[in-house]
A protein has these predicted regions:
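C-terminal effector-binding regulatory domain of bacterial HTH transcription factors
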Residues: 6, 126-135, 145-198
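Central regulatory/effector-binding core of bacterial HTH transcription factors
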Residues: 1-40, 186-198
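Flexible hinge/capping segments at coil-to-helix
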Residues: 38-49, 53-76, 91
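A local structural motif
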Residues: 6-10, 93-102
């Protein structure tokens, strides 16, 4: 905002899909599949989906060794949980199944917070839980299994993609997120201490 002192931002946070025009929103940030095929969309980035749980939960329930072991665990379903239909790939091996959630939270931050509190295992975009992984509040599970990616897109309200302020905001976000996004690495997994940078 220091570069654009006249810029005004009205930030609305939530995982609900509002009508952008009715809400007076120029641009929205959306994770995952988009339902409005008429919207103007610009991809910002894609994060891998990861499974994570707290050490307290894992001390109590044990760690899953394969995706099918998840059936024996408390699952927290959040917005990145794909309605509980999870798919994993490891080399030539693929598995897909429906999981039952013990807890469903429709806000990403709430689902991550529930996992930090030891309520179960959550599937979430890596970028959404990176801090918790780095601080050791969460441990990444089954890192050798690919659970797909979640895209972050900028969705412009009808007729507002041409607004210079909306374009400048999205350009800034893309530059800032790609500048601060570390290269893909392996956050702490079972048996590892979290690696922190100074």
């Amino acid at each position: 905002m220091s570069r654009h002192p006249a810029l005004r931002i009205d930030l609305m946070m939530g995982d609900q899909r509002e009508d952008l025009v009715a809400e007076g929103v120029d641009v929205a940030l959306r994770f995952g599949p988009l339902s409005d095929s008429t919207a103007t969309v610009r991809r910002i980035l894609a994060w891998p989906r990861v499974l994570a749980a707290s050490r307290a939960y894992l001390d109590k329930a044990g760690a899953p060794l394969t995706p099918t072991d998840l059936a024996q665990h408390a699952i927290i379903l959040g917005p990145a949980s794909l309605g509980g239909h999870w798919s994993f790939r490891k080399g030539d091996t693929a598995t897909s199944f429906q999981v039952e959630g013990k807890l469903t939270i429709r806000a990403s931050l709430g689902a991550i917070a529930a996992a930090v509190e030891g309520l179960g295992i959550v599937m979430t975009p890596l970028g959404a839980c990176r801090r918790e992984l780095e601080r050791g509040e969460l441990v990444r599970l089954l890192p050798e299994w690919d659970a797909g990616t979640v895209e972050l897109n900028a969705v412009y309200a009808s007729g507002r993609a041409a607004k210079p302020s909306a374009r400048a905001f999205v350009d800034y976000l893309i530059a800032a997120l790609h500048e601060t996004e570390p290269p893909p690495s392996s956050p702490p997994s079972i048996g590892e201490k979290p690696r922190l940078s100074a």
